[in-house]
Amino acid sequence: MIDNNCLYKEELNRNSYSGLAKEASESILLPSESGFDGSRSPVCSSPDPNLNYRPVIGILSHPGDGASGRLTNDTSSTYIAASYVKFAEAGGARVIPLIYNEPEEVLFQKLELVNGVIFTGGWAKKYDYFEIVKKIFTKALERNDAGEHFPVYGICLGFELMSIIISQNRDILERFDAEDNASSLQFVDNVNNDGTLFQRFPPELLKKLSTDCLVMQKHKYGITPANFQANPALSSFFEILTTCIDENSKTYVSTVKAKRYPITGFQWHPEKNAFEWGSSAIPHSEDAIQVTQHAASYLVSEARKSLNRPESQKVLSNLIYNYKPTYCGYAGRGYDEVYIFTQPRSRF
């Protein structure tokens, strides 16, 4: 016996499918039916003339070989950890190495080729290195004061040196126990993230930054919020965005943004999550990688606002591509790759 209810349901299903198919066919148009001329290329919007789509970041080298002398005994050698180069490239920029001990005339000619600067991590706080950082930092302020948008990232040692320069106090730093651990970031109450590197972070990632260990700490020194605020020069120049707590539950300033300049200071390492593997403490989760990516994108988005567009050939002749990185990760600690500079190869 035929079940009339089943026949009715089958007919209803056929009619529903037919209706959906008809609706789909009416909404999907072939190129010839849409008025689009397939023989012509689509019209793209014009680039913003106020942005530089070929930004170059200068990264200052640091004394040594980056591997405690395992790679070279040349006392004049300097290095840049490749993770900083990859960090800038991940944001969409090219890199020119600023070799700190080459003739100042050459160094500052190179500085005229870039749209922003990174002061890296390391240990050198005195003598020639400090003086070069101070001169480059002063130049960066002058360029911004003259109307050019010129961003600076000071990471770990870079932030420490900027703090010493601004405060004019070498004793502003104190010891902390944060030499090899991941941590969260504690955002200052009522802080405004507009115009900071955190502005483009998705809300969920910002929330995780304050609860999960997504940033890498690798430093012995820092500044307490109290000492920071007690120094008029420092507190008027920078705004504190985040703090961190070290292994002894001692609080230090971890992220700052200059109030009048596109300058950001980190007492953590945004570059390590994606590009360093020597320490098991470095976070490599998807969220941690996004932290690196957003920090890199912010730096380069600021560099695009620089309208400094030097002669192309001079840029090409001084790019990091003219050098080869050295793999030094066999020891299972420290950097994975470094660029070592023993003889300047600048071309002007």
Swiss-Prot record:
Keyword set includes Disulfide bond:
no
Q: Which PROSITE patterns match?
A: PEPTIDASE_C26_GGH
Record's function text: Cleaves the polyglutamate sidechains of folate polyglutamates in the vacuole. Is important for polyglutamyl tail length determination before vacuolar exit. Plays a role in folate stability and intracellular folate content.
Which keywords does UniProt give here?
Cell wall, Hydrolase, Secreted, Signal, Vacuole
Where does it live in the cell? Vacuole; Secreted, Extracellular space; Secreted, Cell wall
Name of the gene this protein is made from: GGH1
Q: What is its EC number?
A: 3.4.19.9
Top-level taxon in the UniProt lineage: Eukaryota
Q: Identify its protein family.
A: Belongs to the peptidase C26 family.
Gene Ontology terms: cellular component: extracellular region; vacuole
Ranges for domain Gamma-glutamyl hydrolase come to: 46-342
Q: Which species is this record about?
A: Arabidopsis thaliana
Q: What is this protein called?
A: Gamma-glutamyl hydrolase 1
Classification via Pfam families: Peptidase_C26
A GO term for molecular function: gamma-glutamyl-peptidase activity
User: According to the UniProt record, what class of enzyme is this?
Assistant: hydrolase
